[in-house]
Amino acid sequence: MPYFALIYDMVDDFVARRAAYRDEHLRLARESYARCQLVLAGALADSPAGALLVFNSADATAAEDFARNDPYVKNGVAKQWKVRPWTVVVGNEEPRVRSAGKD
C-alpha cells in the first residue's frame, strides 16, 4: 500500500497556541494510528514550526481527511498543509525490532 506524507507549516507562535488543541489533535492521531492509517508523526526536530505525519493508505484521502479535521488546521495553528506521495526505498511493511545498543 502506498505512503503519503502530510506536511504542516505552523505559525511562528505554534508552541504557545497549540495548548488549547493539543489533546484533541493527539486523540485524532491515535485514532488514525489505531486504524493503521497513520504510521508515525511528530514535530520537525530542527524547528517547532513544522510537522510530518506519514500515512499508509490506498490513496491520499486518509491524510487529507486528517488535515481537514485536525484542530490545529481548523484553528489556524497550522497555517498551511500539503500531502505528497512518498516512495519508500529502504524498509518494508514488517517492523524491525532493535535491541538497545545494537544496530
Enumerate the language-model features and the residues they cover.
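Conserved, structured core segments of small domains
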Residues: 1-103
